[in-house]
Amino acid sequence: MQNTDTTKYIIHSKINADGVIERPDIVGAIFGQTEGLLGADLDLRDLQKTGRIGRIEVMVTAKGGKTKGNIFVPSSLDKVETSILAASLETIDRVGPCSAKIEVFQVEDVRAVKRKKIIERAKLIFTKMFDETVPESQELADEVRQSVRVDELTYYGKSRIPCGPNVLNSDAIIILEGRADILNLLRYGIKNTICVGGTNIPPEVAELTKKKTVTAFTDGDRGGELIIRELLQVADIDYVARAPDGKCVEDLVQKEIIRALRRKVPVEQIIEKYGIQERENEDSACRLERVSKRKIRAPEIVPRIAEKKLHKRVKVHRVSPKADIHEEEFPEEMEETGPERAPEKIFEKVTERIPERPAEKTSAAAERVEARTSVAKPAVMARAVPATRVTRGKAAAEKGPAVKVPGGEAVRVSPAPARQAPAPVSPEAIRFRPHVDALKGTLTARILDSDDKVIEEIAVRDLASRLKNYRDNVKSVVFDGVITQRLVDIASSNEIKNLIGVKIGNIAKVPADMEVLTSSML
């Protein structure tokens, strides 16, 4: 084949002849029968002289008085001219004395084959030659960074425990599992670290935790959990941070390390989770002292606000020195103190005696004072006992005579109750308490209709998937589990009005037409 360097296409054709013919007969027939057929520009002899087509290859075999074979015509013409040339071969109908038929079945693109070879060779060159001879810039940076980290790594105590250079000078330290974890944090500039080398906590580390604010940062696997359990028993730690599930601290990148340390939780929150009791020795006393500083004394805020508001109350005088009266103006903040504290705040000592007056002479001002009377509202969804109310009209007149305060307004008085009335049973408790008691500790759920009749009783683990496919008259769900935002959303989509569980989880929003209750509220 000639001019293989310039060949673009190869025309593949097959020939069938009724007789015995040889290669020279076929080549002569091709040149002879196509001469002048396509014009001077596409004459095969001229194209072969100029190198536009290559050497015509013929491979034939004769058997049983017939000849079969293949013809290959290389071409450096473009696609259009090559197609015309291939079609002209099919016009040959005789080779020598025999009738013959030529059929083109493929036009091979030689450049595509070359491209495949180039790709395969490039893969081989890339994998075999570059890995060992040309280091990447990242490898150079890692090598320099590794040398710096090794120089910064120091040791603590007689046991030469690996640690960062700032462990002794820093007020807060991070306890890690091993030396590789320290090197990884040094890579990102965190130098106040020390390792414990497994679940056997060194005494030097346990002693160091008494003097500093300590964060335990462990792997997100079973081993990390065991180290935390050991630290809770022998050391004095303040916070706990965990790597993502299934990951090690030594494999974390900078973003994951910062995110995990920001999500650290106080040790008090995980003591109950791991079932560890605090030690009753001096170490525990130190921890409890620090804990008390971190606790937010939210319960102290509400009484302080209520005390300030009590100075603004209206002073009401009583008829006799032994009778107390209901206060006629309540601060709004009394809602937060709870209904059981409200009766203590709504009575005032009498400072002077006022003679009795008939109830018939009650002025219009007294009626206005009664109209403005407010009552303490319960803090949790109207489930608690309501505070004592000051009634209007005739009922108020029956309780006691009207008296006049120094400001000139008349109010009605009544003796203080000897003790608080018993708490009434809420309708929800009557409806759902039997179901709650029956399901306690069973990890099952009951789906109720509008008449509070049980439609179906299933396991809690199947409740979410079952509610998604439920289309019956479901109005309430009572189950022995935690109420989550996912369950609230599913119940809202099915127009369920009541959702009762053991306790409420992290819920961001609850529909206005849905009651979310716990067994303690009932």
UniProtKB/Swiss-Prot annotation:
Ranges of residues in domain Toprim: 171-257
Family matches, as PROSITE patterns: TOPRIM
Gene3D superfamilies: 3.40.1360.10
GO MF term list: DNA-directed RNA polymerase activity; metal ion binding; poly(A) binding
Binding positions (Mg(2+) 2): D219, D221
Domain of life: Archaea
Cofactor note as given: Binds two Mg(2+) per subunit.
GO CC annotation: cytoplasm; DNA-directed RNA polymerase complex; exosome (RNase complex); primosome complex
Entry's EC annotation: 2.7.7.101
Top-level EC class: transferase
UniProt: Mg(2+) 1 binding residues: E177, D219
Keyword Nucleotidyltransferase in annotation: yes
One Pfam family this sequence matches: Toprim_4
InterPro entries: DnaG_primase (IPR050219), Primase_DnaG_arc (IPR020607), TOPRIM_DnaG/twinkle (IPR034154), TOPRIM_dom (IPR006171)
Any one Gene Ontology BP term: DNA replication, synthesis of primer
Catalytic activity: ssDNA + n NTP = ssDNA/pppN(pN)n-1 hybrid + (n-1) diphosphate
Keywords tagged on the record: DNA replication, DNA-directed RNA polymerase, Exosome, Magnesium, Metal-binding, Nucleotidyltransferase, Primosome, Transcription, Transferase
Cofactor: Mg(2+)
Assembly behavior: Forms a ternary complex with MCM helicase and DNA. Component of the archaeal exosome complex.
Family: Belongs to the archaeal DnaG primase family.
Physiological role: RNA polymerase that catalyzes the synthesis of short RNA molecules used as primers for DNA polymerase during DNA replication. Also part of the exosome, which is a complex involved in RNA degradation. Acts as a poly(A)-binding protein that enhances the interaction between heteromeric, adenine-rich transcripts and the exosome.
Name of the featured protein: DNA primase DnaG
Native source organism of the sequence: Methanosarcina mazei (strain ATCC BAA-159 / DSM 3647 / Goe1 / Go1 / JCM 11833 / OCM 88)
Source organism phylogeny: Archaea, Methanobacteriati, Methanobacteriota, Stenosarchaea group, Methanomicrobia
